Amino acid sequence: MESLQSNSKIEEAEQNPKIEEAQVSVSLPEEPTGVLLPSELVDDSAPPESSDAVEESIETASEAEVSISLLEGTTTGTALLPSEENDLAPLESSGIIEEPIDTDLEKLDVVAMDVDQPGSDLKIESDSFSEEAPTTSSSDNPKSPKLDSVANQNGSAMEEDEGDEEQDDPPHKKLKQLDCLTSVAVKEEEEPEQVLPSEAMVVEEAATLVASAAKKSKSKKKNNNVWVTKSTRKGKKKSKANTPNPAAVEDKVLITPVPRFPDKGDDTPDLEICLSKVYKAEKVEISEDRLTAGSSKGYRMVRATRGVVEGAWYFEIKVLSLGETGHTRLGWSTDKGDLQAPVGYDGNSFGFRDIDGCKIHKALRETYAEEGYKEGDVIGFYINLPDGESFAPKPPHYVFYKGQRYICAPDAKEEPPKVVPGSEISFFKNGVCQGAAFTDIVGGRYYPAASMYTLPDQSNCLVKFNFGPSFEFFPEDFGGRATPRPMWEVPYHGFNGRLETNGSEDMKS
């Protein structure tokens, strides 16, 4: 019924002969925010449907020529009929006419553009109608909204035809001009829903171009030129490595830790043998005559200023005081013996214990005498090193280097200490031999040594050395052993067996 009503109104418009020329310009409302792309207006598979009433109205106006132009700038025409300037309320268009327009608008994809852009106005111009089919309106206003709706439909059909012609051979790269590759990527992230399928392909191609350009820039950094020979540079490096280093030509000196007070001794040719003030523990106290020693802070060692390396020698030690908790370990020690430990603590010293008469070496106690010794006893110490000079290790070699004295590192191929054949250490108690304590000892310089122990807040454990020439209990019979010489006859041998001068010139070599 609605279609029939619309046809009657069109016939009334055709009976009006007064309208010979009519130019109708229709402007779309300014609400849409984008321009419709012609390539997306019409679906090829489903052409827009048109009602029968519209087809009849078009047939009656067969000779009418309608020109529709899409203006990008300002619209110019003889008569502009916006919806606001019409005095009469626009007639309600039939649903049959509005249906195809609505369906077409739903299918459109809108690209966001500036709303104020003037290219969104459409102008429809009609030159003239034929005299056989004049159009009249039932109202006084000759421009009826029915004509507007018909013109809108005709204009959309013409636009669809133009879109089909342009879609036949569209330029691929002119769909959207890319100012720069990065702007496309940013726009795609900001408006992912509005990107058309064709634009997505363009964006993908742009991304691939960017990736390829990045790869090319990276590849340029790598110097893969096959025409450049790399052997010349390596050869120069090798030649530099082969050149002798002037610093390497100098003598190499390996600096090693030097023992405490290596170039210092308290023995002089004018003095007789006595206890050393240098080679002793700090907690060991020595008397003014440097023959009596005592300690109350645990086992600490003190040794004499001179030692023997060859021959048979003898000295005595008298236990002056042990106290309630005092103990002693007496014996012989080399120059490498630990001063902060008792005699017999390591392999460089040999001791005789007071508690049970055990002998001690390398911190191992072994049964030796029938009983120990106590206060007032005199212990005799005997050592025999036949031809010990040939088995003694070489003394350390000192050199002067840049104003300082250094000890040369020992040779890696140096042989271990040699055992002196027939060597022996024996202990005597009040002139009675306790038997051979140690035999076949290694060669070296042996010094008389003693170590004392006493608990704190008690009187010191005191012992007194006697180097001769007169002894309190000198043995009358040594049981077939070589007769020893008193230690006071040991000549001055300087520091570490080397004779020292005022300038210590012997150490400079």
Swiss-Prot record:
Q: Where in the cell is it found?
A: Nucleus
One Pfam family recorded for the sequence = SPRY
- Coiled-coil spans are none
GO CC terms: nucleus; Set1C/COMPASS complex
Which stretches does the entry tag as region Disordered? Answer: 1-100, 112-199, 213-246
The residue ranges flagged as biased composition, category Acidic residues, are 158-168
Q: Compositional bias of type Polar residues: which residue ranges?
A: 133-142
Matching entries from InterPro entries are given as: ASH2 (IPR037353), B30.2/SPRY (IPR001870), B30.2/SPRY_sf (IPR043136), ConA-like_dom_sf (IPR013320), SPRY_dom (IPR003877)
Q: What does this protein do?
A: Trithorax-group gene homolog required for early embryogenesis. Required for the expression of FLC and FLC homologs and represses flowering. Required for proper leaf growth and development. Part of COMPASS-like complexes responsible for H3K4 trimethylation, but not for di- or mono-methylation of histone H3 'Lys-4'. Binds to target loci chromatin, increasing H3K4 trimethylation and causing activation of the gene. Involved in the transition from transcription initiation to transcription elongation.
Name listed for the protein in its UniProt record: Protein TRAUCO
Provide the taxonomic classification: Eukaryota, Viridiplantae, Streptophyta, Embryophyta, Tracheophyta
